[in-house]
Structure formats: C-alpha cells, structure tokens
C-alpha cells in the first residue's frame, strides 16, 4: 500500500453527488513504454461499516510535453514514435475481445520493435488499452473515419451530426485513466480537411475533447492528396502534367509518382493550412514528402506520420531519426 485516504460524505436520500479527492505519492514510479509501471487503485463506498460497492482500476503516472524542437517528450525524455495502425484484424475471431489474444498481439508488436499504436479508424477497446498499458505502447486513439462526407454506404457520416458529442465523450471517458493514451485523433483522411467546412467541425470536436481532458494532445490524420481531389486539375495544370489514359495499374503507378509533388504543392499547403493549424500535432498520411517542407515553411508546426507505406519504412524512419 503506497497511499490511502478516507473521505466523509453526506448524501440525501434519492439524490446524486459528485466528489473528488487528492492523494499524493512521494517519488512515484513513472510509466513509459520502456518501463510500464502501473498502480492499482481500489475505491470502496461504505455506509457506516457496511461495504456497498467497490471499484478497481489501474493507472500510470507520467508527464507529456510537446514542442517543435524536442518533439514529444515523456517524463522529460524525447520519444520517437515507431508504431503501426491496427485495423479490425481479428479474422475468424470477429469483433470479440479476447484478452489473451490482445496480450499476444501487443507483445508481438513490442518484440518487433514498435513502441506505439494508432487505432484505425475507430476508438480502441478497453481490453486492448489495458494490454498497451501493461506492456508499454503509446496509443493514438481515433474518433472516426468520416465526418459529413461519406466514404461508403451507411457509414458514420449518416449518424455523425447527431452522435458525435456522445461518441467523443464516451471515447475520452474510456481513455482518461490509461497512461498509454497520448493523442486523440479526430479523423482519418477526412475530405473536408481541404475545405472551409473543416474548421466548423474540427473546432467542435477539439473543444469537446478539451472540456473533458486537457492532459493529452490532439491530431487529425490528413492525407493531403485526398483532401484536395477537387483541386487536382488545377494542380496538374500548373505542373503542365496530365495523367494519360492507360489501364488502371499504369494509372495508379503514375499517380503514386505524382503524390509527393501534389502533397507539397502550394495549392495543397494553402488548402490544408487551417486544418493543420487547429490541432496540436498534424497527422500526415502518405505524405513523407512534407516533412522537410514543414520544418522549413512552418517551423512552429509539430507533425507525425500517422500512416506511411511499410515498404518505405527505412526511408521514413531515417527522416524521423534525423
């Protein structure tokens, strides 16, 4: 037992009461991916000497800081995030959360040299978060894959307008006591991030998150090319480049060669600037070409590679380290 406290409360019949208390630890063991030390908290409600209910939870103690010079710091030490995106990948297991399976998954990722995970593109389950707490993985928890513009039939865009506040609150309250959570992502490859509509929704989401949790940072996983699909004719015209009519494989090959140019084009930079400025950390999907550009043109901007091609890992990791 490292610390304890009793608190007296008077509660009227048929009424509700919220309260808080503080406990102090001298020289606590700090949580990090390298040393995932967890404390166990037991809260018991007594009426007289009779135990009415008891809850138990684990938590970790650590600090976070962020700036363009030192990047992300955990417990005052700079951390380079090397991670992956977890999509629904349980195969035959389906959507059920099996603790042993999740523990195995996290341990395999740790043994592969990863220190971070991003939930793609929905909020992470409590069971997976507990595994990340236990074995030491930093987590980017993601809110949604769509806002108002749909990507497929009957996706979240159908419900977003009425559901976003409740869903964001559920995510943040679920995550709050997990030391592995370092970033909230408000979206993945949202088409609106290249439009004036982006700020309207992003500000709502950011304000809601910060009303519930001011201890974590906020990002948005932006794919600059997908954010500017409506501007591609203007961009390609300025480059005096056209994508000729070929079979689909040749077209995709040519388009991939153009993506770095599109991602760093002044039209693209201007279109995503408002979305980028609203968050603490800009998330870039498949936009490693912007890393050096952002350091030069936006020296106060902090960014993270939220999705990159696995085949480019050596090159992108070299950019991170350098």
Report each predicted region and the residues it spans.
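Secreted/periplasmic carbohydrate-active enzymes, especially glycoside hydrolases
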Residues: 1-131, 135-139, 167, 182-183, ...
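Substrate-binding/catalytic cleft of secreted carbohydrate-active enzymes
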Residues: 107, 116-322
């Amino acid at each position: 037992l490292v610390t304890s406290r009793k608190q007296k409360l008077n509660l009227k019949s048929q009424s509700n009461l919220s309260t808080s208390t503080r406990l102090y630890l001298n020289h606590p063991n700090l949580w990090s991916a390298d040393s995932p030390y967890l404390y166990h908290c037991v809260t018991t409600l007594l009426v007289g000497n009779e135990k009415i209910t008891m809850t138990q939870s684990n938590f970790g103690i650590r600090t976070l800081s962020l700036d363009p010079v030192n990047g992300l710091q955990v417990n005052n030490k700079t951390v380079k995030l090397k991670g992956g995106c977890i999509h629904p990948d349980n195969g035959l297991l389906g959507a059920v959360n099996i603790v042993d399976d999740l523990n195995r998954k996290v341990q395999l990722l740790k043994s592969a040299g990863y220190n971070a995970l991003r939930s793609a593109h929905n909020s992470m389950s409590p069971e997976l978060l507990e595994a990340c707490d236990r074995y030491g993985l930093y987590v980017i928890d993601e809110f949604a894959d769509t806002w108002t513009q749909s990507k497929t039939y009957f996706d979240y865009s159908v419900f977003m307008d009425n559901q976003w506040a409740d869903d964001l609150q559920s995510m943040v309250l679920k995550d709050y006591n997990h030391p592995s959570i370092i970033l909230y992502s408000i979206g993945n490859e949202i088409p609106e991030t290249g439009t004036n509509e982006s700020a309207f929704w992003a500000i709502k989401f950011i304000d809601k998150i910060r009303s519930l949790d001011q201890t974590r940072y906020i990002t948005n996983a932006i794919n600059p090319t997908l954010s500017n699909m409506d501007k591609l004719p203007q961009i390609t015209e300025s480059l005096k480049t056209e994508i000729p009519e070929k079979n689909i494989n040749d077209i995709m090959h040519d388009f991939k060669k153009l993506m770095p140019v599109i991602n760093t084009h002044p039209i693209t930079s201007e279109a995503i600037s408002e979305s980028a400025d609203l968050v603490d950390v800009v998330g870039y999907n498949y936009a490693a070409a912007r890393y050096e550009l952002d350091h030069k043109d936006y020296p106060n901007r902090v960014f993270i590679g939220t999705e990159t091609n696995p085949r480019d890992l050596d090159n992108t990791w070299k950019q991170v380290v350098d």
